[in-house]
């Protein structure tokens, strides 16, 4: 099917596809409300929880923390592609959720387990005959991308490729990245509907060449199918599945491969890795930190011990309050009744309320209104409750700043130097 199809056919297909069946649910579960465009897809991930155990001494805690921050080189086996010769694999240090394989004549295979394989075809060349039908083709140059995965925008910006994005799944007032805001205000990037309700006609008329989605798209499989029927490949970003904060940042290399900006991506990543390397020497304070928000059902939603935000807390020199909690469900967050949350976090030294998910808590009174049980919490009694900024999940490129913030928080550092955290009054 050609992209420049008749508008009537496009609209008819869209109407047909979206009325065939009810919205589906994929493997990427989410605790986030679908209509909150200001929130990144970061809470919509599915990964196995890693169970943690108490360290017996401060020395042991520091040793384990250092081990957890050590880079783990990712190596895999390159797929055979008929007509192409494998040459090398991209070196990855922390990322575990994608691989890039290089073949002759500039061909690349971007493999994202559980999402798909994508053959990047150089400009002026064609995909080899006999290519596995499950391999999606990304034809360079990619200059009219529909970006529905908000966490990727900062990575595009870091390699100076916001110009490759033509369509946004977030409205201008939902962006906290200056370059994205400016591009939308200038008309260089246009709003094309959120991930679950894209403007198909606009994407076709403007010649969209790639849709980059978060795993939220798995909740609306008919939408993904419709986009692909319009001959627009769908790439699903799984950076939120990474268990190390730098694994998430290292996804800049995946986008660098798409846009032939590997060198720029490597340079940027190494700079960020150096920042984390310097931060990992923070002394373990023994302080405990809980990260959570309350959903509309009065349930506490917390980050699992395997989540990269829990890892940030450890690198910053604290212990994650839920490190001993075992949860076998999918997702990097887990639901806890208020009673369960009370049991696990009542004695936590610090509470961090995730305002990028729920921004209703703007004062201590607003938090106390969520449950009477909060009055017993140590952190609330001592005034050690903090909130994150709304921009947190879009800041994929500066993960070290949150680690610094947490360290400043637990060491009574200068609050004016914080980027994301604000003390709740």
Protein language model features and the residues they cover:
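Bacterial N-terminal signal peptides that target proteins for export
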Residues: 2-12
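Structured C-terminal subdomain patch of bacterial secreted/periplasmic proteins
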Residues: 73-75, 242-271, 347-425
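Bacterial Sec-exported substrate-binding components of ABC uptake systems
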Residues: 25-153, 264-291, 414-425
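Extracytoplasmic ligand-binding site segments that recognize negatively charged/polar headgroups
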Residues: 143, 150-161, 168-179, 219-222, ...
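Soluble non-cytosolic domains of exported or imported proteins
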Residues: 139, 193-198, 214-221, 242-249, ...
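C-terminal motif of bacterial Sec signal peptides marking the signal peptidase cleavage site
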Residues: 20-24
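A short, structured surface patch at a secondary-structure boundary
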Residues: 108-204, 210-217
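Flexible, glycine-rich surface segments
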Residues: 275, 281-362
């Amino acid at each position: 099917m050609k992209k420049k199809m008749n508008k009537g056919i496009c609209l008819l297909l869209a109407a047909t596809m979206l009325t065939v069946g009810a919205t589906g649910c994929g493997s990427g579960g989410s605790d986030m409300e679908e209509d909150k465009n200001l929130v990144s897809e970061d809470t919509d991930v599915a990964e196995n929880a890693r169970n943690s155990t108490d360290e017996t001494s401060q020395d042991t805690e520091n040793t384990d923390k250092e081990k957890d921050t050590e880079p783990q080189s990712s190596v895999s086996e390159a797929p055979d592609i008929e007509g192409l010769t494998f040459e090398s694999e991209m070196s990855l240090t922390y990322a575990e959720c994608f691989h890039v394989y290089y073949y002759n004549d500039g061909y690349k295979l971007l493999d994202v387990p559980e999402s798909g394989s994508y053959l990047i075809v150089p400009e002026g060349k064609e995909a080899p005959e006999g290519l596995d039908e499950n391999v999606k083709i990304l034809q360079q140059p990619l200059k009219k991308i529909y970006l529905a995965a908000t966490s990727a925008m900062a990575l595009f910006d870091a390699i100076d490729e916001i110009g490759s994005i033509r369509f946004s799944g977030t409205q201008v007032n939902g962006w906290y990245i200056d370059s994205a805001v400016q591009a939308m205000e200038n008309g260089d990037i246009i709003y094309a509907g959120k991930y679950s309700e894209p403007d198909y006609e606009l994407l076709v008329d403007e010649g969209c060449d790639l849709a980059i989605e978060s795993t939220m798209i798995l909740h609306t499989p008919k939408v993904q199918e419709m986009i692909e029927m319009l001959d627009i490949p769908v790439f699903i970003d799984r950076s939120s599945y990474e268990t190390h904060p730098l694994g998430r940042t290292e996804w800049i290399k995946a986008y660098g491969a798409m846009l032939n900006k590997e060198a720029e991506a490597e340079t940027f990543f190494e700079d960020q890795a150096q920042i984390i390397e310097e931060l990992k020497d923070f002394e373990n304070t023994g302080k405990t930190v809980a990260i959570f928000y309350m959903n509309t059902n009065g349930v506490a939603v917390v980050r699992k011990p395997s989540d990269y935000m829990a890892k940030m807390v450890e690198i910053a020199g604290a212990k994650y309050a839920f490190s001993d909690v075992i949860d076998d469900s999918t997702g990097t967050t887990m639901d806890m009744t208020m009673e369960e949350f009370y049991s696990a976090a009542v004695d936590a030294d610090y509470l961090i309320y995730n305002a990028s998910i729920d921004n209703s808590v703007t004062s201590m009174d607003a938090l106390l209104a969520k449950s009477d049980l909060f009055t017993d919490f140590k952190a609330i009694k001592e005034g050690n409750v903090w909130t994150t900024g709304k921009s947190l999940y879009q800041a994929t490129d500066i993960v070290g700043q949150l680690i610094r913030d947490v360290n400043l928080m637990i060491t009574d550092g200068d609050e004016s130097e914080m980027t994301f955290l604000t003390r709740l009054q």
